[in-house]
Amino acid sequence: MMADKMSINVTSKINSITLVLAMALSAFANGQVRDSTLHFVDSIQLQIKDSSQLPKPKLKTLKGVVFDKTINEPVAFATIYFPKSTVGTVADEQGYFELNFEKVPNDTLRIQAIGYKTFNYIWSKKSIDSFALFVIEQSNTMLKEVVVKAGESPSILFMKEVFKHKNGNDISTNSNYAYELYNKLEADVTGLTKEQFEKIPFTKPFSFIYNNLDSTSEKESFLPVYLIEALSDYYCSNNPKGQREIIKASLQRGIENESIAQFLGSMYQNINCYNNFIDVFNKKFISPLSSAGLLFYKYRITDTQYVKGVPVIQVQFKPKRKGENCFFGSCWIVDSNYSLQRIQLNIPEEANVNFIDKISIYQEYKPLDSTRWFLNKDKLSAHFILPYGSKLPGFIGRKTSSYKNIHVNEAFILDSINRVAQQKELSIVAGAKDKDKSYWLENRHDSLSQNEKNIYKFIDTVQTLPVFNLYKRVIQVVTLGTYDTKYFQFGPYWSMYSRNRIEGTRLRFSMGTTKNLFKDLYLFGYAAYGTLDQKWKYKGSALYLLNRAPRSYVYASYKHDLDRQTGNYEDATSDYLFGNVIRKSGVPIKLAFSDEYRLEFFKEHFNGFSFHTQIVHKDFTPYSPLPSNFIFEQNNNNGMSLSNTEFGIKLRYAYKEKFLEGDYLRASLGSKYPIIELKIAGAIGGFLKSSYTYQKAQLSVSDNVNIAPFGNLYYKVFTGKVLGVVPYPLLEVHPGNDFHYYNRNDFNMMYRYEFVSDRYAGFIFEHTLGNGVFNYIPVIKKFKFRQFWNLKALYGNLSKENYNLNNPSSSSNNYTFRTLANIPYIELGTGIENILQVFRLDFVWRLSPTNIVESIPRNFGVFGSVKFEF
């Protein structure tokens, strides 16, 4: 009566990468729990082996494990049964189950779990006595609301207790703690089918990639392309404040960059669900355990379970209102002390986050002692997509963390922090990247899957292919504008051609060195030629890194070129392919020619303090309409040019500022604390060809303040003074904007060289609201626009002596420098950002002064810009 016993081996393993891929291809439930019928044989390939020689069992057995599709974690206490039968069971806390029956009741196996969609698997009656992995998908739907007429909802009462006890349960509030941290970061290309791949030109050399495509079905595939691991010791003290992390081992394939290893550290990637706000890709989301959680979330108690003999309460949560930065998901709370046992966070479809289709966070805690639970496992996965590129291949990033050797309130922790008090908080030990295979086998917290093991060999093989390097260069040219050979870098291409009224057509060739030529020395230079003035311009510079951490360097340069007076990287410039296209019409271009010699020394300390000294000699010759006669002829000048040698120092304090390191240069990622800068400079008349004696100083404080859930505030306040009687190039020439490209640090409705001062003060203020009012307009909110407003103000004045020098009555030049002595400069702006996820549109009003002397006076302007932000 019974069929021969069949043994079933799973050949298509559902590993962690496969489960992350499934996240990218799943859809949200639109408010309803949906049944999904999948053909089991399509999802898990089974290889059946004949075992007729074995004794026939009395009962047939189906064994398996139920996994969460998004986070690759077992689903505890799921219900597995055959509909319209009495055959069923409940999985244990590890998702494992066994079903025993004499015959297969029907061909449908149903799996249900609270917080998940119901899944029906078409089960082959021949596939029995087997072990299989079942993958189910989370539902963005809570149980139906139960109306409690008398008193508060039990869910609300329970969560109030959780909020009340969270400070005691949060280990990070203890005096000190320490642990060993293992981090793993993986990147995969997803949605790349064989058919799509074959359509890409010149892919024949990559044919072996087909063997590295993992899939759960013929339609779902992804290609692992990058893997990095890091092992570190982390120490933290709250009283006194201090922290220290030592990355003792790192292993990576793909991008060779030390700062990537740093960003895997605990200080860069630490998510604490007990906090009121959780930072996800620089966006503040309200935690479901926030003290104000009842204002933003709906909670429902859905189940009681036992984990390691301890009763835990499952609570589902979701946002009260769509469009707010909140999560949906579930948390499991220990019944005895209201601490977290595990939590699953998902970002809803309506969340205003760019370039990301889905984000999932999973944390699991384990008992530290009889009363305290500490974080044991932490997973973050995100599916990145191009704007409006749902049909294009995407990208999955997945970070997995685990914690061992946990210590709380022990004396050695503070000693470890104090022992290295003069060093930086995050460091990488020498030889961290040189650990061998045996070290990782012994110290890795969890073994790599077979797929992850293949990544190291796979990436090494790909990078040796000439076609791969060609693709890399093409992508670099398109995105960065530069082209690299082994020893030299050429570009950027957008500076190769431009036009202006002085030079006519300007052609420029730029070249720099790469780390393959000099490890710590960067040489850069360019040559340019103007067809109208028929003059060559050029620049040569050298940067030598004395130390990378803490950073110190010397820099020297010589430039023989037009002086465009650009003050920061956001300034638009005419030395640009599209510079004339975005210039304001009717505004004369104001240029000067300069010969500039520069020598700099920079030294940074681990505590965030740095000093930057420089000596700059410049010969400055302005072009009309900027004046020179009767201004520069003071102190034996020839009246047409200004010669000056300035000594300067900049003191800067940026506590816990983060950087993204390049081969030689670096980009600041900002700080959570205010950044303070003090600049002091001066010159001595007659010394090193200086024509004037003066001193000047400027002080500024800037900060980005997150005021979630009300958005983000940026402010900058500044003041300065110039002592001495000097011509306008040595005064404070307030930064105006002659382009329709918006600049956050300039006064966009002010013209360049419109106002000068020898004493001044001002501020810049911008409030980004997020969705703002757009969240309440039914059709508009689907576009996920973001709202902001800003205010800029400046007061400045000139001494009588400086005013008379720079506006001489005997001058034949009609150009007049203005001051802000009688009325401050004020501009007010608002606008829309996140247009098509990358563009920003500013509407700016100049409130005062309104008496504009340019040929086309404007009190209102429209500006565009590009802004890449999650």
Language-model features: locations:
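Conserved "repeat-terminator" motif of extracellular CCP/Sushi domains
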Residues: Q53-P57, A132-M142, V146-G151
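Exposed, low-structure sequence patches enriched in small/polar residues
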Residues: F285, N418-F870
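A short, solvent-exposed loop/turn motif at the edges and junctions
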Residues: F82-K84, T108-Y121
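Coil residues (strongly favoring Ser/Thr
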Residues: D35-S36, D42-S43, S51, T108, ...
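Short, ordered, surface-exposed loop/turn motifs in non-cytosolic proteins
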Residues: K58-K63, K69-K84
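Structured extracytoplasmic
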Residues: N140, K149-V312, K318-C326, G389-G491, ...
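Short, acidic Ser/Thr/Gly-rich low-complexity loop/linker segments typical of extracellular
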Residues: S85-Y96
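Short Pro-Gly-centered beta-turn/loop motif in secreted/extracellular proteins
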Residues: N72-V75, E98-N106
